[in-house]
Structures are given as structure tokens and as C-alpha cells.
């Protein structure tokens, strides 16, 4: 490819504080192992007036997953070496237990454990300890799809992986990372700090320019799925290590970034803690990270030996910034989608009965819709009277049915339009035997509210909103991890006499949790 258009790239970077508004951040572009651009702005701590620098450490959150998998490959070998240990770990499973490779590739079908903490009554700013993580993970008995058939993001996959690595080696993951990954890669200040409450070198901020920015409170312990703190310079060193070892057939990053497939042979979007994407016909590998008050993203294009890194100490869209930086570095112009007018027949709520997942669509203007299906809203471009798509989802409407496809997830669902009013007779207490947790629903002044109770405590009351007959939505916008699960979908079940017998509770991260009415 021709040389990078440095003025265009610099102009984009210098506009980041205006386009991604927040306290501070740091970004870099690396090509051929050399630093093209390295820039920090703003403040690491607004109150202390401490400036952000390329040496400032920040939590890299889920970007840590690739390093956990790197330790696995470097210290133990192929994932199958730990399959018997996983069987002992998930000894409550009834059938269809995943393999360790499924954990590494986010194909396990396990429900995300941070989402499950909500159902177990956790407070968003509560304390979460290592024994509580094992308590939750070891009680699991089922998956929300057959392992190897689909993709679903699950932090618990990598928490379990960390436990298995430590058990197998007899050493702490922190020591293994320092010795086998950080030292060879010259990541001089990178460190595993599992307790988020202990990190105080830089402050992460909740909020925005409308509500203001407030220091985020985090008191969770995470391991394997996240926990590494690193500076921009540390992350640059990782990209340079990747470039130095690019010709090594057994090089760590070559092994981590190798293509993966689903059980049916279809290409998978994720492997060994790395997300696979494509831009302008070029394959990218990388990962994002999030915690309340923090966002980061790295991308690597092996074909062109280019990497981009974005680190924010606020909840800005680091993934968007990193991809746009990559496109600028690759000389890929912004896409110009062709949009059609929105047909009102799109708008409303749609249910897939098999998964209990709900798709909500509303007009966003300019030939776009706002869709709620996963962890956060998506903007869908309407490309025809009955077709719409985003970067993740394709929709095709046929009257009162929408065919939803998420190719990367190997997921195809028939969504049926919800029509009619919801009955108000849902108040009561419901029990999940698998989680040993309760859902309490009450009616106050004609409005329905719900609360979760379990071994982690009793949650606040959350309002419920009717989506259709026996289908309700319970939004949860703050939780221990970020992003939050979003809208929980509640699908109620009745007997022949019309009495409610139970409810299926789920979201994209944790589907199909069955509760029976007490």
C-alpha cells in the first residue's frame, strides 16, 4: 500500500477531543513496527489536575482476554489439554458441556457471568470477590445454545480459563503474564491488577457533557476476562512484538489470530480472545474493553502491518475511533450507505419464541431505525422497503415476521410481531432453581416493578414495560461490568386455565433462564 496520509491521520486524531468528548485519552498508530503517531490529551484525574500521558496506566479490561489465551498456548499448549479439568470444574452440568476451545472462541453457550450477577441481586457498585465468581460459575448446569453452534460473548469463559491455568501450572496468572508475555514483549509497566478498587493511578469517569463527568466506582475482582492495567506505551510495545514475530510459524500472535470455525464449518468471528473484522477487504484482529468509566480498543491489520490503539478514561466510543483511525491509515474512505424511507410497518416489538429474545424497532430519521436486540442500541440503515442492516445485523421483513440474521454469530431467527395488550396479572415471586435466585414482581399504582434476589443480595426495584401479550421488558442500564445487559426480556407462561406458571428471563448475554412461579 502507499504511504500513510499522515496529515489526514493527524487531523483525525487532533479532532478526537471534540468528536469523542471526555476527560482524556491516549491513541497510537504503529506501522512496520515503527510508531507513526503517539498522542495523549486531557487529564488522568480532573480534580488533581493530573495530565494524561502515554505513560499513564489504565485498565485495558477485556483486551486482557488475548493475553490469558497467550499464556494458555505458551505454557500449556492446545486447549484440549484442559478439557478434563473443565469437566471437573463444571461438574453440575446436565448435558452438552462445552470444551475449553469453545471457551477460548466464545462458542461455549455459557451465559455471561456478569449478566448473571444482576439476576443474583448484585449492586452495580458492590463488591465482587473471587470466591463469589467460582460460586456462580460452578453452579451452572445448562447453556443457552449447544456449544460450538453459535457465538455469544461470555466473560465467564475466560474467568474459568484463568482458574484452569492456575490450577494446572500451580502458579498465579499474574506471575505467568509477567514472565511469559509482558517481559518478552517489553511491556515494561503492564501488570495484572484483578481488584479494580486497588487501581488509583488514573480515574475513569461516568457521564457525558450533558450530565457532567463523575468518578466511576468499581469494586469487582476479575481475572482472565480482564484485569490488566497498561499504558499506551505498553500497548505500543505489544504491537511491535507482534510485528517482530510475524514470520515465526509458532509465534504467539500468529497462533492467537488464526481463523476459527463453528462446528458446522462456518467461519467464526472470534478466537483465543480476539475479534475478527474486515475493513476495505482487509482482515483485522483485535479487541475492545469496557468497565464503568473506561473504554479501549486495539486493531491490527497483519497484511499491511498496521495497528491502532485507543484508550479513554471515559465511556466514549473507543471502538469507533480505533476503526476510523485504521481506515484513515489504510486510506479507506468513509462508507456512504444508500438509505430508503422507513415504512411504519417496521416499528414495534418482535419476539423469537425459541430464544425468548425481543427485537424492538423505532424510527431514527433519515432512513434509519434504532434497534434494541443485543447489549446496546444499533442504528440500522433501511436499504429497501423490507430490508435493513447494521454492521452486525441484517433484517428482512415479511408482513408480521422479521427474519433476523447475525452472520458472525451463525444466528438466524424468525421474529414474530407482538400485537395486543399485556395482562397485568404477573405480580408474584418466581424462582430459578439453577441460579438459586428469585425474581419479585410487584404492582404499585398500576405500574409493574421487578427486583432480583440471590446470593449476591437484593437489587433495587426496576420498572417493567409491556412489549406485548405476556412479554415485558426490564431495562438494567448499570451493572457490575460494562456495558450492562441492557433490556431483560420476560416471557410469561400460562397453563390451560390461563394462570401464570413461570417466566423465561433473558438478554443477549444470558438467554433462556427459567423461573417457576412460587
Swiss-Prot record:
Q: Where is the active site?
A: 62, 65
A Pfam family recorded for this sequence: DAP_B
Q: Where is this region: Disordered?
A: 373-392
Binding of substrate, residues: 481
Q: Which InterPro entries match?
A: Bact_CellWall_Synth/Modif, Beta-lactam-related, Beta-lactam/transpept-like, D_amino_pept/lipop_sf, DAP, DAP_B_dom
Residues of the signal peptide = none
Keyword terms, alphabetized: Aminopeptidase, Hydrolase, Protease
GO BP: any one term: proteolysis
Name of the top EC class for this enzyme = hydrolase
Residue segments, region Important for specificity:
477-487
Oligomeric state and partners?
Homodimer.
The UniProt similarity line reads: Belongs to the peptidase S12 family.
**Protein name listed in UniProt:** D-aminopeptidase
- What is the source species? Brucella melitensis biotype 2 (strain ATCC 23457)
Amino acid at each position: 500500500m502507499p504511504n500513510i496520509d499522515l496529515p489526514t491521520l493527524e487531523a483525525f486524531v487532533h479532532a478526537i477531543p471534540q468528536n469523542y468528548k471526555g476527560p482524556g485519552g491516549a491513541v497510537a498508530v504503529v506501522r512496520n513496527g515503527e510508531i507513526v503517531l503517539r498522542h495523549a490529551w486531557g487529564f488522568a484525574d480532573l480534580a488533581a489536575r493530573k495530565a494524561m500521558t502515554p505513560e499513564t496506566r489504565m485498565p485495558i479490561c477485556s483486551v486482557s482476554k488475548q493475553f490469558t489465551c497467550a499464556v494458555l498456548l505458551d505454557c500449556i499448549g492446545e486447549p484440549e489439554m484442559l478439557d478434563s479439568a473443565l469437566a471437573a470444574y463444571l461438574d453440575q452440568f446436565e448435558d452438552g458441556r462445552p470444551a475449553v476451545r469453545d471457551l477460548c472462541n466464545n462458542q461455549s453457550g455459557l451465559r455471561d457471568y456478569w449478566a448473571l450477577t444482576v439476576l443474583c441481586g448484585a449492586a452495580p457498585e458492590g463488591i465482587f470477590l473471587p470466591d463469589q465468581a467460582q460460586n456462580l460459575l460452578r453452579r451452572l448446569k445448562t447453556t443457552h445454545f449447544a456449544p460450538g453452534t453459535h457465538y455469544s460473548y461470555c466473560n465467564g469463559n475466560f474467568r474459568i480459563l484463568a482458574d484452569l491455568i492456575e490450577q494446572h501450572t500451580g502458579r498465579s496468572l499474574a506471575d505467568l503474564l509477567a514472565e511469559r508475555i509482558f517481559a518478552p514483549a517489553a511491556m515494561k509497566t503492564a501488570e495484572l491488577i484483578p481488584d479494580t478498587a486497588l487501581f488509583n493511578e488514573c480515574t475513569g469517569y461516568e457521564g457525558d457533557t450533558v450530565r457532567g463527568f463523575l468518578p466511576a466506582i468499581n469494586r469487582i475482582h476479575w481475572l482472565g476476562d480482564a484485569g490488566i492495567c497498561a499504558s499506551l506505551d505498553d500497548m505500543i510495545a505489544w504491537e511491535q512484538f507482534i510485528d517482530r514475530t510475524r514470520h515465526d510459524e509458532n509465534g504467539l500472535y500468529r497462533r492467537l489470530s488464526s481463523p476459527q470455525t463453528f462446528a458446522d464449518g462456518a467461519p467464526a468471528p472470534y478466537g483465543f480472545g480476539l475479534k475478527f473484522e474486515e475493513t476495505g477487504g482487509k482482515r483485522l484482529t483485535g479487541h475492545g474493553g469496557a468497565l464503568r468509566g473506561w473504554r479501549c480498543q486495539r486493531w491490527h491489520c497483519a497484511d499491511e502491518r498496521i495497528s491502532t490503539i485507543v484508550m479513554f478514561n471515559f465511556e466514549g466510543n473507543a471502538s469507533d475511533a480505533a476503526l476510523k483511525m485504521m481506515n484513515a491509515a489504510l486510506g479507506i474512505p468513509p462508507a456512504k450507505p444508500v438509505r430508503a424511507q422507513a415504512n411504519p410497518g417496521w416499528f414495534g416489538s418482535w419476539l423469537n419464541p425459541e430464544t425468548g429474545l425481543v427485537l424492538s424497532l423505532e424510527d431514527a430519521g433519515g432512513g434509519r431505525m434504532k434497534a434494541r436486540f443485543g447489549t446496546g442500541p444499533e442504528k440500522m440503515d433501511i436499504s429497501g422497503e423490507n430490508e435493513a442492516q447494521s454492521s452486525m445485523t441484517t433484517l428482512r421483513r415479511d408482513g408480521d415476521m422479521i427474519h433476523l440474521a447475525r452472520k458472525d454469530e451463525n444466528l438466524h431467527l424468525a421474529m414474530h410481531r407482538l400485537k395486543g395488550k399485556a395482562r397485568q396479572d404477573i405480580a408474584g415471586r418466581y424462582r430459578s432453581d439453577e441460579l438459586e435466585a428469585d425474581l419479585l414482581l410487584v404492582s404499585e399504582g398500576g405500574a409493574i416493578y421487578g427486583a432480583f434476589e440471590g446470593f449476591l443480595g437484593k437489587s433495587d426495584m426496576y420498572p417493567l414495560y409491556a412489549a406485548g401479550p405476556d412479554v415485558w421488558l426490564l431495562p438494567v442500564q448499570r451493572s457490575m461490568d460494562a456495558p450492562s445487559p441492557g433490556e431483560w426480556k420476560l416471557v410469561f407462561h400460562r397453563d390451560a386455565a390461563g394462570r401464570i406458571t413461570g417466566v423465561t428471563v433473558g438478554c443477549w448475554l444470558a438467554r433462556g433462564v427459567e423461573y417457576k412461579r412460587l
